[in-house]
């Protein structure tokens, strides 16, 4: 059934402002079938990047993101509005990635091919691959913390809420992850300071 005449998924009936994340989530819960799609599209790029950084392969990232969005779609009614909707979505994505990593660890498989792409000739691509490999060598909990804080820009407090741990735990996980990354990537010697 097409939407009613005069209805725009982005603004509802004749409104001139873009709906906030909280308004979109509330509209979804109230039955607006376009609201969740708009919310997902708004955050897709950042959520996919987070999933890719937290997963072993791009396929795992895609699957985890799909799992996360299905969970968010189904569980939207339980959102308490005590945090930003984007933080809630990020927490769901991180949890979906961690769940997949735990399942893979419990049921290891031998890869049929190298999971990392062949580096092309640019130093930027080589560095990105080296960083990705180093991230994959971190324990899952450390990786999730350092990706959220150092790569996604979340505060310690927001990361603690997303991961469901104490702020001190996030700080120690980040410190351990940074120290290990410095050892693993020290050969790059790019002169870039690791954020502390």
From Swiss-Prot:
Similarity section: Belongs to the sigma-70 factor family. ECF subfamily.
Domain-level remarks: The sigma-70 factor domain-2 mediates sequence-specific interaction with the -10 element in promoter DNA, and plays an important role in melting the double-stranded DNA and the formation of the transcription bubble. The sigma-70 factor domain-2 mediates interaction with the RNA polymerase subunits RpoB and RpoC.
Pfam families in the record: Sigma70_r2, Sigma70_r4_2
InterPro entries: RNA_pol_sigma-70-like, RNA_pol_sigma-70_dom, RNA_pol_sigma70_r2, RNA_pol_sigma70_r4_t2, RNA_pol_sigma_r2, RNA_pol_sigma_r3/r4-like, WH-like_DNA-bd_sf
Inactivation phenotype: No effect on growth in culture, or in isolated macrophages; infected guinea pigs have a partially attenuated lung infection.
Intrachain disulfide bonds: none
Positions occupied by motif Polymerase core binding: 63-66
SUPFAM superfamilies: Sigma2 domain of RNA polymerase sigma factors, Sigma3 and sigma4 domains of RNA polymerase sigma factors
Key words of the record: DNA-binding, Sigma factor, Transcription, Transcription regulation
An individual GO BP term: regulation of DNA-templated transcription
Classification via NCBIfam families: PRK09643.1, sigma70-ECF
Free-text function comment from the UniProt entry: Sigma factors are initiation factors that promote the attachment of RNA polymerase to specific initiation sites and are then released. Extracytoplasmic function (ECF) sigma factors are held in an inactive form by an anti-sigma factor (RsaM, AC L7N5D7) until released by regulated intramembrane proteolysis. This sigma factor is required for the synthesis of surface or secreted molecules.
Region (Sigma-70 factor domain-2): 39-105
Region of interest (Sigma-70 factor domain-4), ranges: 130-181
Note: Was identified as a high-confidence drug target. Extracytoplasmic function (ECF) sigma factors are held in an inactive form by an anti-sigma factor until released by regulated intramembrane proteolysis (RIP). RIP occurs when an extracytoplasmic signal triggers a concerted proteolytic cascade to transmit information and elicit cellular responses. The membrane-spanning anti-sigma factor is first cut extracytoplasmically (site-1 protease, S1P), then within the membrane itself (site-2 protease, S2P, Rip1), while cytoplasmic proteases finish degrading the regulatory protein, liberating SigM.
Name by which UniProt lists this protein: ECF RNA polymerase sigma factor SigM
Source organism: Mycobacterium tuberculosis (strain ATCC 25618 / H37Rv)
PANTHER family tied to this protein: ECF RNA POLYMERASE SIGMA FACTOR SIGM, RNA POLYMERASE ECF-TYPE SIGMA FACTO
GO MF annotations, alphabetized: DNA binding; sigma factor activity
Induction remark: Constitutively low in all growth stages; repressed by detergent (3.5-fold). Induced by WhiB5.
Record note on quaternary structure: Interacts transiently with the RNA polymerase catalytic core formed by RpoA, RpoB, RpoC and RpoZ (2 alpha, 1 beta, 1 beta' and 1 omega subunit) to form the RNA polymerase holoenzyme that can initiate transcription. Interacts (via sigma-70 factor domain-4) with anti-sigma-M factor RsmA (AC L7N5D7).
Residue ranges the UniProt entry marks as DNA-binding: 156-175
Cellular-component GO terms for this entry: plasma membrane
């Amino acid at each position: 059934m097409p939407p009613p005449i005069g209805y725009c998924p982005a603004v509802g009936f004749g409104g001139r402002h873009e709906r906030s994340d909280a308004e979109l989530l509330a509209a979804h819960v109230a039955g607006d079938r376009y609201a969740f799609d708009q919310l997902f599209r708004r955050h897709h790029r950042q959520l996919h990047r987070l999933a890719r950084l937290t997963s072993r392969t791009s396929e795992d990232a895609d699957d985890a993101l799909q799992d996360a969005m299905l969970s968010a779609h189904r569980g939207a009614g339980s959102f308490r509005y005590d945090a930003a909707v984007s933080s809630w979505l990020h927490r769901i994505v991180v949890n979906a990635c961690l769940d997949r990593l735990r399942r893979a660890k419990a049921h290891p498989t031998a890869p049929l091919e190298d999971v990392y792409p062949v580096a092309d000739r640019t130093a930027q691509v080589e560095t990105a691959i080296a960083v990705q490999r180093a991230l994959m060598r971190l324990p899952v909990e450390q990786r999730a913390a350092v990706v959220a804080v150092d790569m996604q820009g979340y505060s310690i407090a927001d990361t603690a809420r997303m991961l469901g741990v104490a702020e001190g735990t996030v700080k120690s996980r980040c410190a351990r992850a940074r120290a290990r990354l410095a050892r693993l990537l020290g050969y790059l010697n790019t002169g870039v300071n690791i954020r502390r």
